[in-house]
């Protein structure tokens, strides 16, 4: 009979909006681009993303139309295997940027920043 109460307690830990939540804000929300030209997206965190081990766990994901998201960049500036070098990540603390040096047609999609430093 204690199990439901325990489950409720666990679920309450994951309620968004509780104190300590990290808010990630991207801009711009929409970006018209020209093929062959550069593009950049900014991401700001409400708290520093520097973890106690000294690493900054900020990831960038790309979701092409009709596909699942794939990670492009991890720990701010490290490209995942197979990601073209026209993609680069930079930043520190609370402010981060994803840059595409020369936009290609296959780059159309939705881009997300995600932090992995603070968990509920």
UniProtKB/Swiss-Prot annotation:
Keyword Membrane: yes
Annotated stretches, region: Complementarity-determining-1: 44-59
Molecular function GO labels: antigen binding
Signal peptide (from-to): 1-20
Region (Framework-1): 21-43
Main location per the UniProt record: secreted
Renumbered residue ranges of the record's region Complementarity-determining-3: 114-120
Cellular location(s): Secreted; Cell membrane
Keyword Ribosomal protein applies: no
Gene3D superfamilies attached to this UniProt entry: Immunoglobulins
Framework-3 as annotated region, ranges: 82-113
InterPro entries on file: Ig-like_dom, Ig-like_dom_sf, Ig-like_fold, Ig_V-set, IgV_Light_Chain
Residue numbers spanned by region Complementarity-determining-2: 75-81
Disulfide bond annotation, renumbered to this chain: 43-113
GO biological process: adaptive immune response; immune response
Role description: V region of the variable domain of immunoglobulin light chains that participates in the antigen recognition. Immunoglobulins, also known as antibodies, are membrane-bound or secreted glycoproteins produced by B lymphocytes. In the recognition phase of humoral immunity, the membrane-bound immunoglobulins serve as receptors which, upon binding of a specific antigen, trigger the clonal expansion and differentiation of B lymphocytes into immunoglobulins-secreting plasma cells.
Stated name of the protein: Immunoglobulin kappa variable 2-30
């Amino acid at each position: 009979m204690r199990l439901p109460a325990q489950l409720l307690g666990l679920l309450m830990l994951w309620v968004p909006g509780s104190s300590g939540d990290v808010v990630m804000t991207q801009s711009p929300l929409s970006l018209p681009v020209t093929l062959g030209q550069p593009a950049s997206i900014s991401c700001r965190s409400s708290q520093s993303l520097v973890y106690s081990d000294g690493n900054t766990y900020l990831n960038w994901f790309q979701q092409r139309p009709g596909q699942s998201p794939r990670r492009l960049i991890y720990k701010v500036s490290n490209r995942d295997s197979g990601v073209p070098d026209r993609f680069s990540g930079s930043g520190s603390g609370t402010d981060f940027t994803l840059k595409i040096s020369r936009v290609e047609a296959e780059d159309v999609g939705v881009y997300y920043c995600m932090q992995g430093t603070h968990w509920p």
